[in-house]
Amino acid sequence: MAKKVKKTDDISKKFGEDRRKALDDALKNIEKDFGKGAVMRLGERAEQKVQVMSSGSLALDIALGAGGYPKGRIIEIYGPESSGKTTVALHAVAQAQKEGGIAAFIDAEHALDPAYAAALGVNIDELLLSQPDSGEQGLEIAGKLIDSGAVDLVVIDSVAALVPRAEIDGDIGDSHVGLQARMMSQAMRKLSASINKTKTIAIFINQLREKVGVMFGNPETTPGGRALKFYASVRLDVRGNTQIKGTGDQKDSSIGKETKIKVVKNKVAPPFKVAEVEIMYGEGISRTGELIKIASDLDVIQKAGAWFSYNGEKIGQGSENAKKFLADHPEIFDEIDHKVRVKVGLLEDEVLDNNQETVELPETDEFILDLDDAIEIED
Protein backbone atom coordinates (compact mmCIF):
# COMPACT_ATOMS: atom_id res chain seq x y z
CA MET A 1 0.00 0.00 0.00
CA ALA A 2 2.86 2.37 0.83
CA LYS A 3 4.48 1.80 -2.57
CA LYS A 4 1.21 2.68 -4.35
CA VAL A 5 0.96 5.94 -2.44
CA LYS A 6 4.54 6.81 -3.34
CA LYS A 7 3.92 6.04 -6.99
CA THR A 8 0.79 8.19 -6.98
CA ASP A 9 2.72 11.06 -5.37
CA ASP A 10 5.44 10.80 -8.04
CA ILE A 11 2.84 10.94 -10.81
CA SER A 12 1.14 13.96 -9.21
CA LYS A 13 4.49 15.71 -8.81
CA LYS A 14 5.46 15.05 -12.43
CA PHE A 15 2.01 16.19 -13.58
CA GLY A 16 2.39 19.38 -11.53
CA GLU A 17 5.82 20.05 -13.04
CA ASP A 18 4.42 19.56 -16.55
CA ARG A 19 1.59 22.02 -15.82
CA ARG A 20 4.07 24.53 -14.43
CA LYS A 21 6.28 24.22 -17.52
CA ALA A 22 3.27 24.60 -19.81
CA LEU A 23 2.19 27.73 -17.91
CA ASP A 24 5.70 29.22 -18.10
CA ASP A 25 5.81 28.58 -21.86
CA ALA A 26 2.39 30.19 -22.29
CA LEU A 27 3.46 33.26 -20.29
CA LYS A 28 6.61 33.61 -22.39
CA ASN A 29 4.58 33.45 -25.61
CA ILE A 30 2.07 36.00 -24.30
CA GLU A 31 4.88 38.34 -23.24
CA LYS A 32 6.50 37.93 -26.66
CA ASP A 33 3.26 38.69 -28.52
CA PHE A 34 1.74 41.38 -26.30
CA GLY A 35 4.66 42.84 -24.35
CA LYS A 36 5.99 42.56 -20.82
CA GLY A 37 3.36 42.79 -18.12
CA ALA A 38 0.46 41.59 -20.30
CA VAL A 39 -0.08 38.85 -17.70
CA MET A 40 1.38 38.99 -14.21
CA ARG A 41 0.76 37.57 -10.78
CA LEU A 42 -1.25 39.96 -8.64
CA GLY A 43 1.37 40.01 -5.88
CA GLU A 44 4.04 41.16 -8.37
CA ARG A 45 2.34 44.51 -8.96
CA ALA A 46 4.38 47.43 -7.67
CA GLU A 47 1.29 49.20 -6.30
CA GLN A 48 -1.23 46.86 -4.73
CA LYS A 49 -3.04 49.57 -2.76
CA VAL A 50 -5.36 51.80 -4.76
CA GLN A 51 -3.85 55.25 -5.26
CA VAL A 52 -6.19 58.14 -4.55
CA MET A 53 -6.38 61.90 -4.98
CA SER A 54 -8.23 63.99 -2.43
CA SER A 55 -11.62 65.28 -3.55
CA GLY A 56 -10.86 68.66 -2.03
CA SER A 57 -13.42 68.05 0.72
CA LEU A 58 -12.55 66.34 4.02
CA ALA A 59 -16.12 65.09 4.54
CA LEU A 60 -16.23 63.57 1.04
CA ASP A 61 -12.79 61.98 1.46
CA ILE A 62 -14.06 60.25 4.60
CA ALA A 63 -17.29 59.13 2.89
CA LEU A 64 -15.31 57.72 -0.04
CA GLY A 65 -13.46 55.52 2.43
CA ALA A 66 -10.15 55.44 0.59
CA GLY A 67 -9.41 59.11 1.23
CA GLY A 68 -10.38 60.49 -2.17
CA TYR A 69 -11.06 59.58 -5.78
CA PRO A 70 -9.26 56.41 -6.94
CA LYS A 71 -6.73 57.02 -9.70
CA GLY A 72 -7.24 55.24 -12.99
CA ARG A 73 -10.99 54.95 -12.43
CA ILE A 74 -14.22 56.47 -13.76
CA ILE A 75 -16.32 58.63 -11.42
CA GLU A 76 -19.93 59.69 -12.01
CA ILE A 77 -21.42 62.69 -10.21
CA TYR A 78 -25.16 63.15 -10.71
CA GLY A 79 -28.06 64.96 -9.10
CA PRO A 80 -30.87 67.49 -9.66
CA GLU A 81 -30.29 70.89 -11.22
CA SER A 82 -28.28 73.39 -9.15
CA SER A 83 -27.43 70.77 -6.55
CA GLY A 84 -23.68 71.42 -6.63
CA LYS A 85 -22.42 68.77 -9.09
CA THR A 86 -20.08 71.08 -10.99
CA THR A 87 -18.89 72.62 -7.72
CA VAL A 88 -17.85 69.19 -6.43
CA ALA A 89 -16.01 68.50 -9.70
CA LEU A 90 -14.26 71.90 -9.69
CA HIS A 91 -12.94 71.22 -6.18
CA ALA A 92 -11.36 68.06 -7.61
CA VAL A 93 -9.79 70.16 -10.39
CA ALA A 94 -8.37 72.60 -7.84
CA GLN A 95 -7.00 69.70 -5.77
CA ALA A 96 -5.35 68.09 -8.80
CA GLN A 97 -3.62 71.38 -9.63
CA LYS A 98 -2.64 71.85 -5.98
CA GLU A 99 -0.87 68.48 -6.09
CA GLY A 100 1.04 69.55 -9.21
CA GLY A 101 -1.13 67.74 -11.74
CA ILE A 102 -2.75 68.82 -15.00
CA ALA A 103 -6.54 68.96 -15.30
CA ALA A 104 -8.83 69.24 -18.32
CA PHE A 105 -12.47 70.33 -18.44
CA ILE A 106 -14.70 69.22 -21.33
CA ASP A 107 -17.50 71.80 -21.15
CA ALA A 108 -20.22 70.20 -23.26
CA GLU A 109 -22.84 72.46 -21.65
CA HIS A 110 -20.86 75.60 -22.60
CA ALA A 111 -21.66 77.02 -19.17
CA LEU A 112 -18.40 77.07 -17.19
CA ASP A 113 -17.95 80.29 -15.20
CA PRO A 114 -14.20 81.11 -15.06
CA ALA A 115 -14.66 83.58 -12.19
CA TYR A 116 -16.47 80.99 -10.06
CA ALA A 117 -13.86 78.35 -10.89
CA ALA A 118 -11.11 80.75 -9.80
CA ALA A 119 -12.96 81.48 -6.55
CA LEU A 120 -12.90 77.73 -5.80
CA GLY A 121 -9.12 77.67 -6.16
CA VAL A 122 -8.82 76.59 -9.80
CA ASN A 123 -5.86 78.02 -11.68
CA ILE A 124 -7.75 78.99 -14.84
CA ASP A 125 -4.50 79.89 -16.63
CA GLU A 126 -3.39 76.24 -16.39
CA LEU A 127 -6.78 74.55 -16.84
CA LEU A 128 -7.28 72.88 -20.23
CA LEU A 129 -10.75 73.75 -21.56
CA SER A 130 -12.68 72.32 -24.50
CA GLN A 131 -16.19 73.24 -25.62
CA PRO A 132 -16.96 70.57 -28.24
CA ASP A 133 -19.54 70.87 -31.00
CA SER A 134 -20.79 67.30 -30.60
CA GLY A 135 -20.70 64.38 -28.20
CA GLU A 136 -18.34 62.37 -30.40
CA GLN A 137 -15.91 65.30 -30.59
CA GLY A 138 -15.94 65.79 -26.82
CA LEU A 139 -15.30 62.12 -26.12
CA GLU A 140 -12.55 61.95 -28.76
CA ILE A 141 -10.80 64.96 -27.21
CA ALA A 142 -11.08 63.38 -23.76
CA GLY A 143 -9.69 60.13 -25.16
CA LYS A 144 -6.67 61.81 -26.75
CA LEU A 145 -5.89 63.70 -23.54
CA ILE A 146 -6.12 60.49 -21.52
CA ASP A 147 -4.00 58.53 -24.01
CA SER A 148 -1.24 61.14 -23.71
CA GLY A 149 -0.66 60.08 -20.11
CA ALA A 150 0.12 63.70 -19.22
CA VAL A 151 -3.28 64.62 -17.78
CA ASP A 152 -4.19 63.67 -14.20
CA LEU A 153 -7.87 64.59 -14.25
CA VAL A 154 -10.49 64.96 -16.97
CA VAL A 155 -13.97 66.33 -16.18
CA ILE A 156 -16.83 65.93 -18.68
CA ASP A 157 -19.74 68.30 -17.97
CA SER A 158 -22.15 66.80 -18.71
CA VAL A 159 -23.16 63.43 -20.20
CA ALA A 160 -26.64 64.75 -21.02
CA ALA A 161 -25.05 67.52 -23.11
CA LEU A 162 -22.96 65.09 -25.19
CA VAL A 163 -25.28 65.27 -28.20
CA PRO A 164 -24.52 62.81 -31.05
CA ARG A 165 -23.60 64.36 -34.39
CA ALA A 166 -26.55 62.69 -36.13
CA GLU A 167 -28.95 64.43 -33.76
CA ILE A 168 -27.29 67.82 -34.32
CA ASP A 169 -27.44 67.44 -38.11
CA GLY A 170 -31.06 66.26 -38.02
CA ASP A 171 -34.21 68.27 -37.48
CA ILE A 172 -35.88 68.98 -34.17
CA GLY A 173 -38.48 66.28 -33.64
CA ASP A 174 -36.53 63.51 -35.38
CA SER A 175 -36.37 60.26 -33.44
CA HIS A 176 -32.91 59.05 -32.39
CA VAL A 177 -33.72 56.15 -30.10
CA GLY A 178 -30.71 54.83 -28.19
CA LEU A 179 -28.22 56.91 -30.16
CA GLN A 180 -26.60 58.59 -27.16
CA ALA A 181 -26.58 55.33 -25.18
CA ARG A 182 -24.71 53.55 -28.00
CA MET A 183 -22.22 56.43 -28.21
CA MET A 184 -21.54 56.28 -24.45
CA SER A 185 -21.29 52.49 -24.49
CA GLN A 186 -18.65 52.61 -27.21
CA ALA A 187 -16.79 55.41 -25.43
CA MET A 188 -16.67 53.45 -22.16
CA ARG A 189 -15.26 50.41 -23.94
CA LYS A 190 -12.53 52.50 -25.55
CA LEU A 191 -11.67 54.76 -22.61
CA SER A 192 -11.73 52.39 -19.63
CA ALA A 193 -8.47 50.56 -20.42
CA SER A 194 -6.61 53.79 -21.22
CA ILE A 195 -7.90 55.47 -18.04
CA ASN A 196 -6.61 52.58 -15.93
CA LYS A 197 -3.27 52.40 -17.72
CA THR A 198 -2.49 56.12 -17.43
CA LYS A 199 -3.91 56.44 -13.88
CA THR A 200 -6.13 59.30 -15.03
CA ILE A 201 -9.24 60.18 -13.04
CA ALA A 202 -12.23 60.67 -15.35
CA ILE A 203 -15.19 62.47 -13.78
CA PHE A 204 -18.49 62.40 -15.69
CA ILE A 205 -21.13 64.85 -14.48
CA ASN A 206 -24.67 63.72 -15.23
CA GLN A 207 -28.19 65.06 -14.92
CA LEU A 208 -31.40 63.38 -13.79
CA ARG A 209 -34.43 62.34 -15.81
CA GLU A 210 -37.69 60.68 -14.78
CA LYS A 211 -39.03 57.47 -16.26
CA VAL A 212 -42.53 57.80 -17.66
CA GLY A 213 -45.25 55.64 -16.14
CA VAL A 214 -43.33 54.39 -13.09
CA MET A 215 -45.85 53.73 -10.32
CA PHE A 216 -43.59 52.03 -7.78
CA GLY A 217 -39.93 52.53 -6.96
CA ASN A 218 -37.65 55.40 -7.85
CA PRO A 219 -38.63 57.01 -11.18
CA GLU A 220 -35.31 58.87 -11.44
CA THR A 221 -32.70 57.79 -13.95
CA THR A 222 -29.60 59.26 -15.61
CA PRO A 223 -29.29 59.83 -19.38
CA GLY A 224 -26.67 58.14 -21.53
CA GLY A 225 -27.68 54.52 -21.03
CA ARG A 226 -26.39 52.00 -18.54
CA ALA A 227 -22.76 51.74 -19.65
CA LEU A 228 -21.51 54.56 -17.42
CA LYS A 229 -23.23 53.01 -14.39
CA PHE A 230 -21.36 49.74 -14.97
CA TYR A 231 -17.94 51.21 -15.77
CA ALA A 232 -17.94 53.79 -12.95
CA SER A 233 -16.00 52.75 -9.85
CA VAL A 234 -17.61 55.53 -7.81
CA ARG A 235 -21.04 57.13 -8.22
CA LEU A 236 -21.99 60.20 -6.19
CA ASP A 237 -25.55 61.45 -5.69
CA VAL A 238 -25.48 65.19 -4.90
CA ARG A 239 -28.59 66.72 -3.33
CA GLY A 240 -29.07 70.26 -2.06
CA ASN A 241 -30.80 70.36 1.30
CA THR A 242 -31.77 73.37 3.44
CA GLN A 243 -30.74 76.95 2.74
CA ILE A 244 -28.12 78.66 4.89
CA LYS A 245 -29.17 82.09 6.10
CA GLY A 246 -26.70 84.90 6.63
CA THR A 247 -26.07 86.91 9.77
CA GLY A 248 -26.33 90.60 10.52
CA ASP A 249 -27.38 92.55 7.45
CA GLN A 250 -27.73 89.28 5.49
CA LYS A 251 -29.95 87.51 8.01
CA ASP A 252 -32.85 87.44 5.53
CA SER A 253 -30.69 86.35 2.60
CA SER A 254 -29.58 82.88 1.58
CA ILE A 255 -25.78 82.66 1.45
CA GLY A 256 -25.48 78.94 0.73
CA LYS A 257 -27.06 75.55 1.15
CA GLU A 258 -26.43 72.41 3.11
CA THR A 259 -25.69 69.61 0.66
CA LYS A 260 -25.62 65.84 1.06
CA ILE A 261 -23.31 63.76 -1.14
CA LYS A 262 -24.18 60.07 -1.03
CA VAL A 263 -21.75 57.44 -2.31
CA VAL A 264 -24.24 55.13 -4.04
CA LYS A 265 -21.55 52.94 -5.63
CA ASN A 266 -17.98 52.33 -4.50
CA LYS A 267 -15.64 49.62 -5.79
CA VAL A 268 -12.71 50.57 -3.54
CA ALA A 269 -14.45 50.94 -0.16
CA PRO A 270 -17.83 50.27 1.48
CA PRO A 271 -20.57 52.32 -0.26
CA PHE A 272 -23.67 54.22 0.92
CA LYS A 273 -21.81 56.65 3.17
CA VAL A 274 -22.99 60.26 3.19
CA ALA A 275 -20.94 63.46 3.30
CA GLU A 276 -22.69 66.58 4.57
CA VAL A 277 -21.10 69.81 3.36
CA GLU A 278 -21.97 73.49 3.18
CA ILE A 279 -21.79 74.96 -0.32
CA MET A 280 -21.51 78.73 0.00
CA TYR A 281 -22.58 80.81 -2.99
CA GLY A 282 -19.55 82.21 -4.79
CA GLU A 283 -17.12 80.26 -2.59
CA GLY A 284 -17.91 76.56 -3.01
CA ILE A 285 -17.60 73.95 -0.27
CA SER A 286 -16.81 75.51 3.11
CA ARG A 287 -13.67 73.59 4.04
CA THR A 288 -13.33 75.40 7.35
CA GLY A 289 -16.96 74.67 8.21
CA GLU A 290 -16.70 70.94 7.55
CA LEU A 291 -13.39 70.74 9.41
CA ILE A 292 -14.85 72.40 12.53
CA LYS A 293 -17.86 70.07 12.50
CA ILE A 294 -15.87 66.85 11.99
CA ALA A 295 -13.04 67.85 14.34
CA SER A 296 -15.58 68.72 17.06
CA ASP A 297 -17.28 65.33 16.66
CA LEU A 298 -13.89 63.61 17.01
CA ASP A 299 -12.86 65.83 19.96
CA VAL A 300 -9.87 67.21 18.06
CA ILE A 301 -11.50 70.60 18.59
CA GLN A 302 -13.33 71.04 21.89
CA LYS A 303 -16.63 72.88 22.14
CA ALA A 304 -17.95 74.38 25.37
CA GLY A 305 -21.11 76.35 24.93
CA ALA A 306 -20.55 78.66 21.98
CA TRP A 307 -16.74 78.58 22.30
CA PHE A 308 -14.42 76.42 20.20
CA SER A 309 -10.98 75.52 21.58
CA TYR A 310 -7.92 73.78 20.20
CA ASN A 311 -4.92 72.66 22.27
CA GLY A 312 -6.47 74.38 25.30
CA GLU A 313 -6.71 77.75 23.56
CA LYS A 314 -9.96 79.36 22.42
CA ILE A 315 -10.16 79.95 18.68
CA GLY A 316 -13.52 81.67 18.43
CA GLN A 317 -16.98 82.20 19.84
CA GLY A 318 -19.50 80.69 17.46
CA SER A 319 -18.80 78.71 14.32
CA GLU A 320 -18.42 81.79 12.09
CA ASN A 321 -15.60 83.21 14.25
CA ALA A 322 -13.94 79.79 14.41
CA LYS A 323 -14.17 79.52 10.60
CA LYS A 324 -12.57 82.93 10.23
CA PHE A 325 -9.75 81.95 12.56
CA LEU A 326 -8.92 78.80 10.58
CA ALA A 327 -9.15 80.70 7.29
CA ASP A 328 -6.67 83.28 8.61
CA HIS A 329 -4.28 80.63 9.97
CA PRO A 330 -3.80 77.92 7.30
CA GLU A 331 -0.97 76.23 9.24
CA ILE A 332 -3.36 75.46 12.11
CA PHE A 333 -6.02 74.38 9.60
CA ASP A 334 -3.55 71.89 8.08
CA GLU A 335 -2.55 70.57 11.51
CA ILE A 336 -6.16 69.93 12.55
CA ASP A 337 -6.96 68.44 9.14
CA HIS A 338 -4.04 66.01 9.51
CA LYS A 339 -5.12 64.95 13.00
CA VAL A 340 -8.67 64.29 11.78
CA ARG A 341 -7.44 62.18 8.84
CA VAL A 342 -5.26 60.16 11.21
CA LYS A 343 -8.19 59.59 13.60
CA VAL A 344 -10.51 58.32 10.85
CA GLY A 345 -7.80 56.08 9.39
CA LEU A 346 -7.12 57.93 6.13
CA LEU A 347 -3.50 58.67 7.09
CA GLU A 348 -0.86 57.12 9.29
CA ASP A 349 0.42 59.30 12.13
CA GLU A 350 3.86 59.80 10.59
CA VAL A 351 4.08 63.59 10.55
CA LEU A 352 2.95 64.61 14.01
CA ASP A 353 4.74 62.76 16.82
CA ASN A 354 5.91 63.38 20.36
CA ASN A 355 9.17 64.94 19.18
CA GLN A 356 7.53 67.45 16.86
CA GLU A 357 6.15 70.67 18.22
CA THR A 358 2.62 71.57 17.26
CA VAL A 359 1.73 74.98 15.90
CA GLU A 360 1.24 77.53 18.64
CA LEU A 361 -1.91 79.57 18.53
CA PRO A 362 -1.33 83.29 17.97
CA GLU A 363 -2.23 85.77 20.64
CA THR A 364 -4.71 88.28 19.25
CA ASP A 365 -7.14 90.76 20.72
CA GLU A 366 -10.14 89.07 19.12
CA PHE A 367 -9.96 85.98 21.36
CA ILE A 368 -11.30 87.16 24.71
CA LEU A 369 -12.16 85.17 27.81
CA ASP A 370 -15.62 84.55 29.21
CA LEU A 371 -17.14 87.29 31.36
CA ASP A 372 -16.40 85.33 34.55
CA ASP A 373 -12.70 85.28 33.66
CA ALA A 374 -12.50 88.80 32.27
CA ILE A 375 -9.48 90.83 33.24
CA GLU A 376 -10.02 94.39 34.35
CA ILE A 377 -7.75 96.78 32.54
CA GLU A 378 -6.63 99.76 34.55
CA ASP A 379 -6.42 103.13 32.89
UniProtKB/Swiss-Prot annotation:
Localization of this protein: Cytoplasm
PROSITE patterns in the cross-refs: RECA_1, RECA_2, RECA_3
Binding site for ATP: 79-86
Pfam families tied to this protein: RecA, RecA_C
Gene Ontology biological process: DNA recombination; DNA repair; SOS response
Keywords (A to Z) from UniProt: ATP-binding, Cytoplasm, DNA damage, DNA recombination, DNA repair, DNA-binding, Nucleotide-binding, SOS response
One term under GO cellular component: cytosol
Major place of residence: cytoplasm
A GO MF label: single-stranded DNA binding
Domain of life: Bacteria
InterPro entries per UniProt: AAA+_ATPase (IPR003593), DNA_recomb/repair_RecA (IPR013765), DNA_recomb/repair_RecA_CS (IPR020584), P-loop_NTPase (IPR027417), RecA-like_C (IPR049261), RecA-like_N (IPR049428), RecA_ATP-bd (IPR020588), RecA_C_sf (IPR023400)
Family, per entry: Belongs to the RecA family.
PANTHER family, alphabetized: MITOCHONDRIAL DNA REPAIR PROTEIN RECA HOMOLOG-RELATED, RECA
Protein function: Can catalyze the hydrolysis of ATP in the presence of single-stranded DNA, the ATP-dependent uptake of single-stranded DNA by duplex DNA, and the ATP-dependent hybridization of homologous single-stranded DNAs. It interacts with LexA causing its activation and leading to its autocatalytic cleavage.
HAMAP family tied to this protein: RecA (MF_00268)
Protein's UniProt name: Protein RecA
Organism annotation: Streptococcus uberis (strain ATCC BAA-854 / 0140J)
Source species taxonomy: Bacteria, Bacillati, Bacillota, Bacilli, Lactobacillales
